[in-house]
């Protein structure tokens, strides 16, 4: 981990796509890493097709880790083992309790409706996603999945984790930002693809078109898709989801506000993006 790297200050929001659901978020002088996964494959057969956009040893000093749920593509024990244990690790209560029992004593539960302040000015609010996040078939008590809204007095970012599109998916943004008559700066949304013979996919995930619909509902200034281009899938390639999203964007009226970045690339939104 690299100390002394400059931090995003002022009203800038910087997002670096590490891969899959691992994003490095820098805002309000704070650095947060989401769902860290730096493994070369998922399970035995689903190989990683792109190296992490930032090597785990090259990460800057972090202020917090955010875990959304216990699925293996979002909760990587091998990755957690390589990160310092003095970084606060926030997760759904049942997941955090499990992590503590496994020796990750820096894990802290954060539940739907709760929030924590990181640094001097960044507030992280939690909402419940529509996604069964238990790791195994027998641990349904561990199925809760978090989504997170990060906001200071100047900027905001919504990290959806894994979720389906439902009439209430926007509830966290509504409760925190809309109640203050504020607009969301950027929606960080997962995209996926499953063939027609797998209809259950959309009960817990967003397709690219679902993500565009949610982006419209959230009334955010910008959108960044993730959850693509990292691991092979059983029913699709690693790039099917982003290829379909790009096709949908060709004639979409929001295409100039959707930012597709490759692993290792960063997007910075300054104050001018909020005018």
PLM segments and residue spans:
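Cap/insert and terminal regions of metallo-dependent hydrolase folds
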Residues: 94-97, 164-263
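Divalent metal-coordination and catalytic microenvironments
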Residues: 25, 35, 69, 76, ...
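Active-site metal-binding loops of divalent metal-dependent hydrolases
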Residues: 36-38, 70, 129-130, 161-163, ...
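Metallo-beta-lactamase
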Residues: 2-10, 92-155, 244-273
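Pre-active-site segment of Zn-dependent metallo-hydrolases
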Residues: 2, 6, 28-70, 77-82, ...
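Conserved beta-strand hairpin/beta-sheet module of binuclear metal-dependent hydrolase folds
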Residues: 8-54, 64, 141-161
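Structural motif
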Residues: 30-32, 63-64, 88, 122, ...
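Catalytic core of the metallo-beta-lactamase
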Residues: 18-27, 117-183, 206, 210
